[in-house]
Design a protein with these regions (language model features):
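Terminal accessory carbohydrate-recognition/targeting modules of carbohydrate-active enzymes
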Residues: 1-204, 208, 535, 573, ...
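Short coil/turn segments at secondary-structure boundaries
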Residues: 227-237, 498-505, 561-565, 606-608
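The feature captures the catalytic groove of carbohydrate-active enzymes
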Residues: 159-174, 280, 284-301, 307-317, ...
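Generic detection of long, well-ordered alpha-helical segments
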Residues: 181, 185, 202, 206, ...
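Long, well-ordered core segments of solenoidal/helical folds
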Residues: 216-225, 262-282, 322-341, 430-447, ...
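C-terminal capping/lid segments that line or modulate ligand- or cofactor-binding pockets
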Residues: 2-41, 45, 298-313, 443-488, ...
Length: 612
């Protein structure tokens, strides 16, 4: 078998991604920075009435002290075109940017302003990169170790540190040479022809695509510590985390969505999170500058996502790059989270020294095991016994076992593609073994798979969408799957309703809490259940899940341009209860369902056929 893998592919990919102008800086979507130089412009606003300044702006921060409101407009993944509208105090402006032949063009257009409202163009060297900056009238020069970048601003108002211009008319900024507003506008319009447009490419799901593409594109940023482009869940999560934070299953799902039309970012994110693997052999719950959850992982979805990315793009180097780490992680689950053939979530104590972080609160405790589940405060785990000797929940977890079996099968297929026949067999056998144990969690009387208390041997009736995950791995037969849908999915006392699926059954005492994983709707749950439904002859359920997920996403996307972290299961609102970021990328999985339903994504239930 031919193997052209060199081991340099990932570095070469990042070298291509991390260059040129874009909104690379985490702290503000109004900052435009050139890589690798690190020279950039931070656009700020001054309120003419109060003299207050908006120094940083992020999408979805209406409830923060600064209270800016941003409508995220079209944006290419590489930042060659960006557009947004910003409202703050009495200022309402549109900001457009374009990059052509590595030159930056910015156009700031007032929509509604008052007298003395101003734009401040503040140049700087980002991330402590070396360079000298000088300002002369309406021009800025950035002398870096790579090149000298010249910027020109229409209008006057120079100070020693920045350029302040009135917003009573449009402001044009260009690099390379001075240009008029009309010339910059011409460049903007030229670049605008390259923006992703759901209406032309994804005609059956245009706004689902636009929501997904924009939340991914606007949350793509630069990690200066590791010199990489990544797509974290939300900039709002990253700012207090030191500039970036990666969560395990969130990042894999982002990579899956990105694989639709940005192969490079899909690869980059799948590699980034997988390469955060710990010395113990698991991909951690979360990682950020100086912090990594060394006690716990998160729901395993990595091999499945990598398999699907490969199915879309057929480049084996990605499989070679990630296979060994995915295999270590796969074996880690069986070696460290198995209790009598069942899998349960846990947390491994370790000495984290004198440096304290809030995520350390759960180490070696039930809280940490709940965090490993990814369902932090789910009522499923309220009354679970936590074994302080092995540091695991004493609960056979239907959702975890299903996801793990799916990982075993996915990684087995990848092993087959790579010609690793012994490992392929190992993984196939492991999947079969856990599938047999999962079958024992079927409750014939109740018509659903149920978590089981491993102390008492009793089933738990705290019902969550995770109990439908066995559909993912075809453990139920058609009759069982039909019962699951009829008796539980379509049961209005449990999961059915105008908005679905609540993270705990509607008749559960915790449903009324409407707080995080206690009743609210989460896109990854819908997505995983939808993938499972596709494995069966359940056409109505498949259609209903796609349609209701679409309607839920579009309820807040149309008009608000928000993609929420989670949603109210009664009203479909995303911002009614706190703890729901307004621009969180996995919320777009609600739209990815519809995009997949219309055939724009390779069918995940079909096996890999390329074994050459």
């Amino acid at each position: 078998m031919r193997n052209d893998y060199t081991g340099n592919e990932a570095a070469e990919l990042q070298a291509e991604l991390t260059k040129g102008w874009s909104t690379w800086y985490t702290g503000s979507v109004l900052s435009h920075v050139s890589l690798p130089e690190g020279f950039g412009l931070n656009l700020m606003l001054m309120d003419g009435q109060s003299g207050d300044t908006l120094e940083r702006a992020l999408i979805g921060r209406e409830s923060f002290a600064s209270k800016e409101h941003i409508i995220a407009g079209p944006r290419t993944y590489d930042g060659s075109y960006t557009e947004l509208e910003l409202e703050w105090r009495n200022i309402h402006i549109r900001i457009q940017s374009a990059t052509l032949k590595n030159e930056l063009y910015l156009l700031i257009t007032p929509i509604k302003v008052t007298q003395d409202d101003s734009l401040i163009i503040d140049p700087g060297m980002f991330w402590n990169r070396e360079g000298e900056i000088s300002i002369d009238q309406n021009s800025i020069s950035g002398q870096t170790r790579f090149s000298t970048i010249s910027m020109y601003v229409s209008g006057n108002g120079t100070t020693s540190d920045n350029i302040k211009v009135s917003l009573d008319k449009a402001v044009a900024i260009s690099s390379g040479e001075s240009m008029s507003k009309e010339e910059v506008e011409k460049m903007i319009n030229k670049a605008k022809t390259n923006i992703p447009d759901g209406k032309s490419t994804y005609k059956k799901t245009p706004e689902l695509y636009n929501a997904m593409q924009r939340v991914l594109a606007w949350n793509t940023l630069y990690d200066p510590i590791n010199n990489r482009a990544i797509t974290p869940v939300s900039r709002n999560w990253c700012v207090p985390s030191g500039g970036w934070v990666l969560f395990e299953w969130d990042t894999y799902f982002a990579a899956y969505m990105l694989s639709l039309d940005s192969k490079e970012l899909a690869y980059a994110n799948a590699i980034a999170i997988t390469k955060e693997i710990t010395d113990k052999g698991f991909v951690p719950n979360n990682t950020q500058p100086g912090i990594k959850s060394l006690d716990r992982s998160q729901p395993p979805v990595g091999a499945f996502v990598v398999k699907e990315i490969y199915k879309n793009h057929k480049e084996k180097w990605l499989l070679y790059e990630l296979f060994d780490d995915l295999l270590k992680w796969n074996r880690w689950w069986a070696d460290n989270r198995d209790i009598d053939g069942y899998l349960s979530y846990g947390t491994d104590p370790y000495d984290y020294g004198d440096v304290y972080h809030r995520s350390y609160r759960g180490i070696g405790k039930l809280k940490g095991a709940k965090w490993e589940s990814g369902l932090d405060n789910s009522p499923m785990y309220d009354d679970v016994v936590f074994d302080t000797t092995i540091h695991q929940m004493m609960l056979a977890d239907v959702g975890l076992m299903s996801l793990y079996i799916n990982e075993c099968r996915s990684l087995s297929e990848i092993a087959g593609v790579l010609g690793k026949t012994e490992i392929e067999q190992e993984l196939t056998e492991r999947a079969a073994s856990y599938s047999k144990k999962l079958e024992t969690l079927w409750n014939e009387e109740f018509g659903l798979y149920l978590n089981k208390d491993l102390v008492t041997g009793q089933f738990s009736y705290r019902l969550s969408p995770t109990l439908f995950y066995p559909l993912l791995v075809k453990v139920p037969n058609q009759e069982q799957a039909t019962r699951m849908m009829k008796e539980h999915f379509y049961n209005p006392e449990e999961f059915w309703g105008e908005y679905i699926m609540p993270s705990i059954a509607r008749n559960d005492s915790a449903y009324k809490d409407n707080h995080y994983w206690r009743g609210r709707i989460w896109a990854p749950m819908n997505f995983l259940v939808y993938l499972g439904i596709r494995n069966y002859e359940l056409p109505d359920a498949q259609k209903d899940m796609a349609e209701k997920s679409k309607n839920l996403l579009l309820k807040s996307w149309i008009g608000e341009n928000h993609v929420y972290e989670n949603y109210n299961a009664e009203t479909g609102q995303g911002d009614d209860a706190g703890w729901s970021d307004k621009f969180y990328h996995w919320g777009a999985l609600l739209g990815f369902i519809g995009i997949m339903e219309e055939g724009y994504v390779a069918s995940p239930e079909l096996p890999l056929v390329d074994k050459n």
